[in-house]
């Protein structure tokens, strides 16, 4: 299993809306993530800095990257553009983090 972590931003006035939209996420999005090998996906909110810290375990980079081309992911990204910064393709602006410590 490959562990990934990344940081995104949420608009300062959208903390509650961001959380509402994720509780729960669309069932079809959850199904796509799982069918593409994503496990133990969690997102944490740092309210003071408007940051989202996400962790996920994936089975392969190829399968994880393929999620982006699914219709449900494209619709989700568009749905989220009013609550967080997005790239021109509507994907969330994000920065991947380098793992520096892990205690199994």
UniProtKB/Swiss-Prot annotation:
Gene3D superfamilies: 3.30.70.100. The keyword Cytoplasm applies. Keywords: Carbohydrate metabolism, Cytoplasm, Isomerase, Rhamnose metabolism. It holds the Pfam family rhaM. It is found in: Cytoplasm. The active site is at residue 22. Its EC number is 5.1.3.32. Its main location: cytoplasm. It catalyses: alpha-L-rhamnose = beta-L-rhamnose. Coiled coil: none annotated. Pathway: Carbohydrate metabolism; L-rhamnose metabolism. GO terms for cellular component: cytoplasm. InterPro entries: Dimeric_a/b-barrel, L-rhamnose_mutarotase, Rham/fucose_mutarotase. Involved in the anomeric conversion of L-rhamnose. PANTHER family: L-RHAMNOSE MUTAROTASE (PTHR34389:SF2). Belongs to the rhamnose mutarotase family. This is L-rhamnose mutarotase. It comes from Escherichia coli O8 (strain IAI1). The lineage of its organism: Bacteria, Pseudomonadati, Pseudomonadota, Gammaproteobacteria, Enterobacterales.
């Amino acid at each position: 299993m490959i562990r990934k972590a990344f940081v995104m931003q949420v608009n300062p006035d959208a903390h509650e809306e961001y959380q509402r939209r994720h509780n729960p996420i669309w069932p079809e999005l959850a199904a796509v993530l799982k069918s593409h090998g994503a496990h133990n996906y969690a997102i944490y909110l740092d309210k003071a800095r408007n940051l989202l810290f996400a962790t996920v375990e994936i089975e392969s980079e190829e399968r994880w990257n393929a999620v982006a081309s699914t219709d449900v992911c494209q619709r989700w990204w568009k749905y989220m553009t009013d609550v967080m910064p997005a790239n021109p393709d509507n994907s969330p602006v994000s920065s991947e983090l380098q793992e520096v410590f892990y205690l199994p």
